[in-house]
């Protein structure tokens, strides 16, 4: 992932996303609902819930909001039946895009996702059309402020991380999918806080966009997908450095 992480931009991006914080919290609450219904309300016995909680905390979701979402999911407060759906397609100039969704209306979500692909120079494909270009990996991001790089690196590698990189104020820690929870929990026990904590699709290779108008379309495709209430995460292999 070296040279393509662009995680140094995450601080600036977070500032511009403050206005969308409510939308992000709504998405996190939806993910918590699904995790609780599938495995119970105790994160110590529900790895999926524990993972979602850490992801929510990385998004600065207050503990009160997290607790309310868990209690609501444990009762009868939210009767919607959500399902995980993954869409695959291409953006402008052959950029591969994977869209992870959590929805209570499959038809609505499919229509919205297809609309954005069509509107911004892409096309929605079949399952498997681009996922072979990615590997499922664990990703942990830590703000480097006031932390010793060598100490964080050794703690990460000792915990089982595959790779560690310092990228302009952000420590980037990559793990195998099966080791993600172990590495995350070990670092949490050591007191580290994450800017991002999630399983991601890591591209095997990257694609550059040469036409400036297509750069604009690709940015709008990503932004519109990420703004959708049903979309949890957007992955792509665009090298936008």
From Swiss-Prot:
Cellular component GO terms, alphabetical: cytosol
Main location: cytoplasm
MF annotations from Gene Ontology: DNA binding
SUPFAM superfamilies cross-referenced by the UniProt entry: YebC-like
GO biological process, one term: regulation of DNA-templated transcription
Keywords: Cytoplasm, DNA-binding, Transcription, Transcription regulation
Family recorded in the similarity comment: Belongs to the TACO1 family.
Species of the source: Finegoldia magna (strain ATCC 29328 / DSM 20472 / WAL 2508) (Peptostreptococcus magnus)
Compartmental location: Cytoplasm
Chloroplast keyword on record: no
Pfam family, one: TACO1_YebC_N
Keyword Transcription (UniProt): yes
Name listed for the protein in its UniProt record: Probable transcriptional regulatory protein FMG_0893
């Amino acid at each position: 992932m070296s040279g393509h992480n662009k995680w140094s931009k995450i601080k600036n991006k977070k500032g511009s996303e403050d206005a969308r914080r409510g939308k992000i919290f709504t998405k996190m609450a939806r993910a918590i609902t699904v995790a609780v219904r599938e495995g119970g309300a105790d994160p110590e016995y529900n790895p999926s819930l524990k993972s979602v909680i850490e992801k929510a905390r990385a998004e600065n979701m207050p503990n009160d909001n997290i607790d309310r979402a868990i209690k609501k999911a444990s009762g009868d407060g939210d009767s919607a039946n959500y399902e995980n759906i993954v869409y695959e397609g291409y953006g402008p100039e052959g950029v591969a895009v994977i869209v992870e969704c959590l929805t209570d209306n499959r038809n609505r979500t499919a229509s919205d996702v297809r609309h954005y692909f069509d509107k911004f120079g892409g096309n929605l494909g079949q399952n498997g059309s681009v996922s072979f270009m990615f590997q499922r990996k664990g990703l942990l991001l830590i703000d480097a402020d006031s932390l010793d790089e060598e100490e964080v690196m050794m703690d990460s590698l000792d915990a089982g991380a595959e790779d560690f990189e310092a990228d302009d104020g952000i420590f980037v820690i990559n793990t195998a999918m099966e080791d993600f929870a172990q590495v995350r929990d070990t670092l949490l026990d050591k007191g580290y806080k994450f800017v991002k904590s999630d399983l991601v699709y890591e591209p095997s290779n990257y694609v550059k966009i040469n036409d400036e108008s297509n750069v604009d379309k690709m940015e709008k495709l990503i932004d519109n997908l990420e703004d959708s209430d049903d979309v949890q995460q957007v992955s792509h292999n665009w090298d936008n450095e």
